[in-house]
């Protein structure tokens, strides 16, 4: 006893906390030194000591023991401030949504992690004996993550799809959650008892599947003789030292270990604690160890590959069922995983960037040649360095050198002054390059309604030429110009509110007056609905029930921001007038009714064709408008013909028309005379019962089918086609010619008037009008001739551009003209289908836009058509206007044509605005509760889109110091320009005035100046409409601002409406600060006064102020998908843009058991890295280049299987270690070996042994290939544990697992033999279990200790031993390969 006391005095006292992990190490070392019996005695004493201390301490847990962190308040406040700053950047359009999401996640994750660290310090300093602190710190109950959520903050959560929610839960469970935080928390959190009950059954089922896979794995041999192994090294940075020790202890070396010439460990040596310490001390090379993954046994395992037994320190005994032990070891912690994920489910865990901070104050010096500017993943400007970079910080006394790692972002500029501890760089080089990434799509929704505008960086996807899917070629802004979009209501009610600036015109046929706008909207609606639309011929009023009648366009000018009535398609008024309105068309009555009284052409509207895109782009030789003359209209079916028997001089001309801006040619015939042959046509279903026969004669009102009667009498022709029956009735005369009559040449031809023809009574008569002669042959021997009347149409060219439009007093453009062409719409001899309810148009008068391409022009071939309305007191005039544009994709300065739906009044009608607004009232409109309605092309079939632009959507920038701060700065002009072209600009509320800022109607000139002057004389307009002597600034196409001198020569073009300055001396060029149509971001300094308070588009530029239409910018990255068309109306919540980006799959969003099951069942991930294919190709080329083509392929396949197995083991271990569960790698390796041991025979090489598609063992395939001396083509597959359980060598084991009937019937048909090698099949049949004591009768004792000494090494010397080992296989491969 005294000696023992003396020894205790010499012992070292360790004052450390003994947690669960330390206890495990202590017990393991006690077993190594003292054995099992003495260790159990020591553990009993430790247990007694623990019970005594716990009883004396009397630890209890209460709600007051949950101490919150004092610094949480200002930490959360600081994070909120950073998030608010970044939210402002996003609002300004400086960063896009993905960058904002990344920054928000990292801000809150860093805050949460800092709170976690503060939690430990707070407990140690304030209450070190706190029960919560004792429990989680000792590892007895809970972990740091759970306690952090109790007393810190829950942080970021994931939604059910695994995506991060950028709104963090700032509260902890001690403080309580708000309603929003509770709903977010419920997305990913487990729900206690319910979750435990469900997951417990899942854990049991997982254990059953695991045991089913490996139940036949028993130790049956001492050494399998393999030369393979897994290389483990503690110095490659991939494995911590503690994990390295746990991996090596209990293993067996696969090769000798040398340090220089000295051998410190031999092959097949058991690795203990002492040997591991020697490896660490001597810094040995990578160590090759034997694992179950490399064991050569097919249905069992050897002692050396398994290693030390988990119960004692020696090698595992023969006959031990290590497979069942492995399944139990992995499945048993399943219940613990379920319970442990109660508080951690759904909480985001990730990594942040490593920051490099400045050691002191000073000036930064770096080599700018080694870096290039870029943009960080958070949207900050930075410099990227791909190699190591040394940064020098020059302080007053000393120079500090900071080493920046490669692939880092430098956040400071050269020669910039930095403060101590300021972040100068961030590095993400520590992340693995082979991290799994998933492709994520993030949709950005519109915050408010408005119009979509974009820059020239948007182009159509090739497969979506006519769709609304666009891609971005480079980073640019998308703008939503604010408005209040709304759909037309289902009832014909007014959408205007009180005090809205508007005017309503409705066309009354009988009274020919405009209904006045009443004070209430209901009265106005009643007057509109009661308008008389029953037109009479004597009044020469158009029939509004026809196609394309009463749709009009209204442009809103600067002086009168007024609108026309917007009518709903479903209302009775709208359905009568516009029931058959075609898409992308609108009609403008350009002439009044009185002007057409003395002309042959009846009053009708002209249908304007607008392309489907928002800008209304027309191309050369395209139809701009068309007019349907009622003289060429028929109500019955028939066919048209152009040629005659004797007259073949009919002029034929083919024009190819560009349709909708693409090279789609449609042939239209231009003729002088054509003939229409009427007939009655009925299209019947194939199953109809016809009551008349083919080639029979019927009368009027004859019963054709059960519910159909004929309208005319004549010859019946019945033709049966696929699923329909076409029945025609030809009316005319039947003529039976004699045998000598030569009638064949007159078959199906036209006979002009004056030609003699014979009748059935042998008499000759002269034809008075054109007739159609057609030979009918009902049988081979009989025939007769059908003579039908023909309607002749002479196409008169009486409709010209002068007829449709007022005469042009100014000269036209030399290289552009409008031609009126009559086109026949139907081909010769082709049938025209119609009925008696609707009419058929035979000829269409088209207004074709022609270009003379021989002469040089300042413009490209594209043009844009619109209609301008000029209003003065009581007179309204509409003009067709064509603007030439540069390119179809150049949308800068272009706006969607605002189309109004309603009826236009005549010139003599009363106008609701009796008091014109003065110049002062114009500017006041922006500050009152008044608005203007914009309507757009009806792309939605269900409802009409429109946008209300009110004063709340505009912002006015007044000068800070009076007139001193103008928007333009005068400069002296140095160069001479013969002609300065002034491009069209956007007006304040949607109009298109040709002058940049026009405050009066004097500058809204049309192409008919005399007509405008007459208007002014009629209205006795006084000074507001006289010539002003104010300064006006024009914007040229090069975005230069020019000051116009009214005394200079000014030429105004007819169809162009561009201003051309003929003399350069008459204007002074200035530099622009704000240009019309320019988009301005919020708080961006433009002049010296002050930055704009809101983002928007400049819609009015004046000398002393600027009006901005508010807009919301969205920054989009290359590859993003833009939804919708340019100028399209968006509603709040509509998808504007979709981002496609990659993100790393977060560590454990799916916690616990589901994650383990996902890996073990080998379920595919949602998506992999987009550049993974390139990595694999590069890796394969590298191996092939080093080892040659045949060897490279073989070794590449081998390494792929080995690396995949190791990766699976690491994945499973990662999940368990995250939950604090430690499982030895050997158990997981046995499971992974079984699910990766099968290969699929491919069809490339047909073998006589295996059939294509058969699953066989990997080792069996290799041995068969060596025995047959021919390669077997196969590919490795990963089977899940369920599928692996149904693909074993025992059909009895498979049938007892699941699908019993299928497995047994398939085994009976295939004649399978069960060799009863596993444990389960012997239990089922009542045999001796081949494990434990039953193992001795199964294996010959002489073979138990038979070893195969091999001095080969797989992973040393460039894998030469592998090639030697498979020399026969390689020789056969080389012999069979083509030379």
Swiss-Prot record:
Main localization, broad class: plastid
PANTHER family, per the entry: DNA-DIRECTED RNA POLYMERASE SUBUNIT BETA (PTHR34995:SF1)
Biological function: DNA-dependent RNA polymerase catalyzes the transcription of DNA into RNA using the four ribonucleoside triphosphates as substrates.
Cofactor details (free text): Binds 1 Zn(2+) ion per subunit.
High-level lineage: Eukaryota, Viridiplantae, Streptophyta, Embryophyta, Tracheophyta
Name of the protein: DNA-directed RNA polymerase subunit beta''
Record GO cellular component, one term: plastid
Pfam family, any one: RNA_pol_Rpb1_4
Cofactors that this protein relies on: Zn(2+)
Superkingdom: Eukaryota
Family according to the record: Belongs to the RNA polymerase beta' chain family. RpoC2 subfamily.
InterPro entries: DNA-dir_RpoC2_beta_pp, RNA_pol_beta''_euk, RNA_pol_Rpb1_3_sf, RNA_pol_Rpb1_4, RNA_pol_Rpb1_5, Rpb1_funnel_sf
Annotated stretches, region: Disordered: 503-524
Subcellular location: Plastid
Organism per entry: Cuscuta exaltata (Tall dodder)
Enzyme Commission number, as recorded: 2.7.7.6
Binding site for Zn(2+): 224, 295, 302, 305
GO BP terms, alphabetized: DNA-templated transcription
HAMAP family: RNApol_bact_RpoC2 (MF_01324)
Broadest EC class assigned to this enzyme: transferase
GO molecular function: DNA binding; DNA-directed RNA polymerase activity; metal ion binding
Record keywords, A-Z: DNA-directed RNA polymerase, Metal-binding, Nucleotidyltransferase, Plastid, Transcription, Transferase, Zinc
Subunit structure: In plastids the minimal PEP RNA polymerase catalytic core is composed of four subunits: alpha, beta, beta', and beta''. When a (nuclear-encoded) sigma factor is associated with the core the holoenzyme is formed, which can initiate transcription.
Substrates-to-products reaction catalysed: RNA(n) + a ribonucleoside 5'-triphosphate = RNA(n+1) + diphosphate
């Amino acid at each position: 006893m005294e000696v023992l006391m003396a020894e205790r005095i010499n012992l070292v006292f360790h004052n450390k906390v003994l947690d669960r992990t330390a206890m495990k190490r202590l017990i393991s070392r006690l077993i190594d030194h003292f054995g099992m019996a003495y260790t159990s005695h020591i553990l009993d004493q430790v247990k007694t000591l623990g019970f005594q201390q716990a009883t004396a301490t009397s630890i209890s847990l209460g709600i007051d023991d949950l101490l919150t962190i004092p610094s949480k308040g200002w930490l959360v406040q600081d994070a909120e401030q950073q998030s608010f700053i970044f939210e402002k950047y996003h609002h300004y359009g400086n960063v896009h949504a993905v960058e904002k999401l990344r920054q928000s996640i990292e801000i809150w994750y860093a805050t949460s992690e800092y709170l976690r660290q503060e939690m430990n310090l707070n407990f140690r300093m304030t209450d070190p004996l706190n029960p919560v602190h004792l429990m989680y710190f000792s590892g007895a109950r809970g972990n740091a993550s759970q306690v952090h959520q109790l007393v810190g903050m829950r942080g970021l959560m994931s939604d059910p799809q695994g995506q991060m929610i950028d709104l963090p839960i700032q509260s902890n469970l001690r403080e309580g959650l708000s309603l929003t935080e509770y709903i977010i928390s419920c997305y990913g959190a487990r729900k206690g008892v319910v979750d435990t009950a469900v997951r417990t059954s899942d854990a049991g089922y997982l254990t059953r599947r695991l045991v089913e896979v490996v139940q036949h794995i028993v130790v049956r041999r001492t050494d399998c003789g393999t030369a393979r192994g897994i290389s483990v090294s503690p110095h490659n940075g991939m494995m911590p030292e503690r994990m390295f020790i746990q991996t090596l202890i209990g293993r067996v070396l696969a090769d000798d270990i040398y340090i220089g010439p000295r051998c410190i460990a031999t092959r097949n040596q058991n690795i203990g604690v002492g040997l591991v310490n020697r490896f660490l001390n001597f810094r040995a090379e990578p160590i090759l160890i034997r694992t179950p993954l490399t064991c050569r046994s097919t249905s069992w395992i050897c002692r050396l590959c398994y290693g030390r037994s988990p119960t004692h320190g020696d090698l595992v005994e023969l006959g031990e069922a290590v497979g069942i032990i492995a399944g139990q070891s992995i499945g048993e912690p399943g219940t613990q995983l379920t319970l442990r994920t109660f508080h951690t489910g759904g909480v985001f865990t990730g990594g942040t960037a490593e920051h490099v901070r400045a050691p002191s104050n000073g000036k930064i010096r770096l080599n700018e040649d080694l870096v290039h500017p870029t943009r960080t993943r958070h949207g900050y400007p930075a410099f990227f360095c791909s190699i190591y970079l040394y940064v020098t910080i020059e302080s007053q006394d000393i120079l500090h050198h900071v080493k920046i790692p490669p692939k880092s972002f430098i956040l400071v500029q050269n020669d910039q002054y930095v403060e101590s501890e300021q972040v100068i760089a961030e590095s993400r080089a520590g992340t693995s390059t082979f991290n799994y990434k998933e492709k994520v799509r993030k949709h950005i929704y519109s915050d408010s309604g408005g119009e979509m505008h974009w820059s020239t960086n948007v182009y159509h996807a090739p497969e979506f030429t006519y769709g609304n899917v666009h891609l971005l070629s480079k980073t640019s802004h998308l703008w939503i110009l604010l408005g209040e979009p709304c759909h037309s209501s289902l009832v014909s009610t007014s959408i205007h509110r009180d005090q809205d600036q508007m005017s309503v015109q409705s066309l009354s046929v009988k009274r020919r007056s405009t209904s006045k706008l009443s004070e209430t909207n209901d009265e106005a609606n009643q007057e509109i609905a009661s308008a008389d639309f029953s037109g009479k011929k004597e009044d020469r009023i158009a029939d509004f029930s026809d196609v394309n009648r009463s749709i009009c366009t209204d442009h809103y000018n600067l002086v009168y921001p007024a609108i026309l009535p917007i009518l709903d398609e479903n209302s009775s008024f709208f359905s009568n007038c516009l029931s058959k309105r075609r898409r992308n068309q609108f009609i403008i009555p350009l002439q009044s009714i009185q002007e057409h009284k003395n002309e042959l052409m009846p009053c009708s509207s002209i249908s304007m064709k607008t392309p489907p895109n928002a800008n209304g782009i027309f191309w050369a030789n395209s139809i701009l408008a068309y007019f349907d003359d009622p003289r060429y209209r028929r109500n019955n079916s028939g066919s048209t013909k152009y040629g005659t028997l004797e007259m073949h001089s009919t002029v034929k001309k083919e024009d190819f028309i560009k349709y909708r801006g693409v090279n789609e040619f449609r042939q239209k015939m231009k003729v002088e005379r054509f003939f229409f042959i009427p007939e009655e046509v009925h299209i019947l279903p194939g199953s109809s019962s016809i009551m008349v026969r083919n080639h029979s004669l019927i009368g009027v009102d004859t019963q054709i089918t059960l519910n159909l009667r004929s309208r005319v009498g004549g010859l019946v022709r019945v033709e049966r086609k696929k699923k329909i029956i076409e029945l025609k009735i030809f009316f005319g005369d039947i003529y039976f010619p004699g045998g000598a009559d030569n009638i064949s040449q007159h078959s199906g031809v036209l006979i002009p008037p004056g030609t003699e023809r014979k009748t059935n009574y042998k008499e000759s008569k002269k034809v008075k009008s054109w007739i159609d002669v057609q030979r009918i042959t009902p049988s081979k021997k009989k025939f007769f001739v059908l003579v039908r009347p023909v309607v002749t149409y002479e196409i008169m060219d009486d409709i010209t551009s002068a007829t449709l439009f007022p005469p042009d007093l100014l000269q036209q453009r030399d290289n552009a003209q409008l031609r009126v062409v009559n086109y026949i719409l139907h081909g010769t001899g082709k049938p025209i289908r119609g009925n008696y309810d609707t009419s058929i148009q035979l000829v269409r008068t088209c207004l074709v836009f022609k270009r003379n391409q021989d002469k040089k022009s300042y413009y490209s071939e594209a043009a844009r058509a619109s209609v301008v309305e000029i209003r003065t007191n009581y007179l309204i005039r509409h003009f067709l206007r064509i603007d030439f544009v540069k390119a179809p994709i150049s949308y800068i300065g272009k706006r969607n044509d605002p189309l109004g739906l309603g009826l236009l009044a005549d010139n003599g009608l009363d106008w609701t605005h009796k008091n014109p607004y003065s110049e002062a009232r114009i500017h006041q409109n922006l500050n009152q509760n008044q608005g203007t309605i914009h309507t757009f092309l009806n792309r939605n079939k269900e409802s009409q889109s429109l946008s209300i632009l009110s004063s709340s959507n505009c912002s006015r920038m007044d000068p800070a110091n009076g007139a001193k701060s103008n928007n333009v700065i005068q400069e002296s002009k140095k160069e001479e320009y013969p002609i300065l072209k002034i491009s069209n600009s956007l007006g304040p509320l949607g109009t298109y005035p040709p002058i940049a800022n026009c405050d009066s109607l004097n500058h809204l000139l049309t192409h008919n100046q005399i007509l405008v002057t007459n208007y002014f004389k009629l209205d006795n307009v006084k000074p507001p409409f006289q010539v002003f002597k104010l300064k006006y600034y024009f914007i040229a196409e090069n975005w230069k601002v020019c000051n116009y001198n009214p005394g200079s020569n000014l030429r105004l073009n007819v169809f162009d409406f561009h201003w051309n300055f003929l003399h350069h001396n008459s204007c002074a060029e200035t530099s622009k600060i704000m240009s019309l149509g320019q988009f301005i971001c919020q708080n961006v300094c433009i002049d010296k006064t002050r930055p704009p308070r809101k983002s928007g588009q400049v819609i009015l530029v004046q000398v002393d102020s600027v009006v901005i239409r508010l807009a919301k910018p969205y920054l989009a990255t290359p590859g993003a998908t833009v939804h919708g068309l340019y100028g399209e109306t968006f509603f709040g919540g509509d998808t504007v843009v979709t981002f496609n980006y990659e993100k790393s799959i977060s560590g454990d969003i799916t916690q616990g058991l589901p994650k383990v099951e996902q890996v073990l069942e080998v379920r595919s991930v949602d998506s992999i890295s987009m550049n993974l294919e390139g990595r694999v190709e590069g890796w394969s080329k590298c191996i092939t280049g080093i080892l040659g083509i045949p060897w490279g392929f073989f070794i590449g396949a081998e390494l792929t299987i080995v690396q995949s197995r190791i990766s699976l083991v690491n994945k499973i271990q990662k999940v368990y270690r995250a939950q604090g569960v430690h499982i030895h790698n050997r158990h997981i390796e046995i499971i992974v070996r079984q699910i990766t041991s099968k290969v699929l025979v491919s069809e490339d090489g047909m073998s006589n042994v295996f059939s294509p598609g058969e699953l066989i063992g990997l080792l069996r395939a290799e041995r068969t290939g060596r025995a047959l001396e021919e390669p077997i083509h196969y590919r490795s597959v990963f089977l899940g544990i369920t599928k692996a359980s149904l693909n074993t060598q025992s059909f009895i084991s498979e049938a007892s697992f699941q699908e019993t009937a299928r497995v047994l019937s398939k085994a009976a048909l295939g004649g399978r033999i069960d060799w009863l090698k596993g444990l389960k099949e012997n239990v089922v049949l009542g045999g001796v279990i081949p494990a434990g004591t039953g193992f001795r009768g199964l294996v010959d004792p002489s073979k138990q200790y038979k070893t195969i000494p091999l001095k080969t090494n797989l992973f040393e010397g460039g894998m030469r031993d592998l090639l030697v080992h498979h020399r026969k296989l390689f020789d056969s491969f080389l012999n069979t390969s083509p030379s």
